[in-house]
């Protein structure tokens, strides 16, 4: 298995009441196959005449099985503190690039294989408006949403 990744987190305070909090990260995974094995035909089938009887309980692939994933995340949190309230906006983005290839018949002959690929992008936004904590009555309101493609 090959894996790696990293993350950077930075905070900038351009003024006493404004904070910008930025995060970026990437993770990569490249794995080999999974140790599945052939269990024989389904119940009710004549197991004595099983065509692949010698492979029952054995790991016997004819193709390499792999799983690879790249995951990129980034986000920005902007927080403004006024005298009586706090305004916060959080924006996030994620990119997933994923591929799985499996020999699904679990035999040394080519009967059934599967390849699954995913490429997914997601952007999200959350805006909140809330009272300061030093008041007897506290309130919060906001809106959030996301979009995937």
Protein language model regions, located:
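Transmembrane beta-barrel wall of Gram-negative outer-membrane proteins
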Residues: 1-34, 72-76, 121, 125, ...
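Flexible loop and strand-edge segments within Gram-negative outer membrane beta-barrel domains
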Residues: 19, 24-69, 110, 114-118, ...
